[in-house]
């Protein structure tokens, strides 16, 4: 990230990532935290994170922002909770400028999370590398990094140029 970037924290929840994102953008950068639930945003405000970012209630599949509004899109824990990951990732691409960076994050890797929940890892899991690469490619993103470690799952992508 660069100072002065316009950054969207999609599905920001209580705003846990907002202090780090604000530090990266500096005081002049635009920082927006979006979440579906009023309760999560109220908790973010209670924790003082409304002073760091503009907090907006909204649905990731129908974002209340103009096309090409953000230089960076960050989402922690979002992808596995999207009823239609294709629609959500396509909508994130819509509001991203050409060349924007996308960071998809989860604080636990796939294998560790599967063990924690007593599940088997499957190839059709939305967070599997082949599946997330396919989803992102089909929705306007170019994957530059996939990191699936025990203590994190991180995918970085760049918004492809549009005609």
Residue spans for each PLM region:
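A short acidic, Gly/Pro-enriched loop at the edge of an enzyme's catalytic core
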Residues: 61-72
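Short, glycine-/aromatic-enriched active-site segment of Class I SAM-dependent methyltransferases
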Residues: 107-123
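Short alpha-helix
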Residues: 124-139
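Core SAM-dependent methyltransferase catalytic element
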Residues: 139-141, 147-163
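Class I SAM-dependent methyltransferase SAM/SAH-binding core
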Residues: 8-10, 14-62
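A short SAM/SAH-binding and catalytic strip from SAM-dependent methyltransferases
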Residues: 72-84
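A short glycine-rich, Lys/Arg-flanked "PGG" loop and its adjoining helix->strand segment in the class I
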Residues: 86-98
């Amino acid at each position: 990230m660069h100072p002065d970037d316009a950054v969207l924290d999609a599905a920001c929840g209580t705003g846990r990532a907002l202090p780090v994102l604000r530090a990266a953008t500096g005081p002049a950068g635009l920082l927006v935290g979006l979440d579906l639930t009023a309760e999560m945003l109220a908790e973010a405000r209670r924790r003082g994170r409304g002073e760091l970012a503009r907090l907006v209630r909204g649905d990731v599949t129908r974002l209340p922002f103009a096309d090409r509004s953000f230089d960076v899109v960050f989402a922690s824990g979002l992808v596995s909770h999207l009823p239609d990951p294709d629609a959500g990732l396509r909508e994130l691409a819509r509001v991203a400028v050409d060349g924007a960076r996308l960071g998809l994050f989860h604080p636990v890797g796939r294998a560790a999370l599967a063990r924690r929940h007593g599940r088997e890892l499957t190839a059709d899991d939305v967070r599997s590398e082949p599946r997330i690469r396919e989803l992102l490619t089909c929705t306007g993103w170019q994957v530059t990094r996939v990191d699936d470690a025990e203590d994190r799952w991180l995918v970085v992508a760049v918004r492809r140029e549009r005609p």
